[in-house]
Amino acid sequence: MKPLKNLLFFCVAALFFSCQHTPQRPVEMSDRQILGLTDKVQQVTLISQHIDEEKRDTTFLTFDSKGRMTEKIEHLQRTKDSILKTKYVYDDAQHTRLAQTYKSDGTLLNEELATYNAYNFVEKYTLTNGETKEVITVVFNYSADGLKAEAKATDGKGELFLTSNIEYNPRGQAVKEEVYITKDKKHSYTTYYVYDEKGALIDKKDYNVKEKNIRNYTFTHTYDNAGNKKEERIYIDGSLSIINKTEIRK
């Protein structure tokens, strides 16, 4: 697959603009709520540390009064483009969300445009490469009850290359996702998600159909006295792999 298609392969699995690890159907939960934060929080710093590496990634987030992200600044020590800045613009009348991500030298890395339907579900998503102008489009079709969706991804020529079937809980969080790669014409992988009573992801299982193996992810969460998430630990196949810390900025 081309680089942008490679990016979208992972994008479909985290397509709904949150910092969580799961597809989110409608915006019944705001970006702030998905992160486990209360309504009073306006700015946070996220620190992600991989256990087997000294380098860590730091992300600064700003929210509007509705809990939607308006700005994201990423200091990524583990990648070539170390500083990325994303601006989010909302048009409530047109039901759209525009996100533009820039590199540290000011050049546009990519642009994401999401369009919502009358029920506030993501209906169409377009990802444009800022350098090559290559475009990927994902269209979502929902069941009558909104608990299932089929997402189809096409390239700039209109050729279908990926299909994702997603099942949701009443909160709009994915509980199951099946991905099919058109080129192989085969079921590629299935992912299952489990949440706690707060809506936080606590378990994720990735089943790779081709390789016939399962990768297990377990998530533990710690909260402060105000109810804001302050730490998340991610275990992969039983071993602690990532520690994510949240610091509230005044």
Segments from the language model and where they lie:
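Buried hydrophobic residues that stabilize the cores of well-folded domains
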Residues: 20-250
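Bacterial N-terminal signal peptides that target proteins for export
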Residues: 1-8
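C-terminal motif of bacterial Sec signal peptides marking the signal peptidase cleavage site
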Residues: 15-18
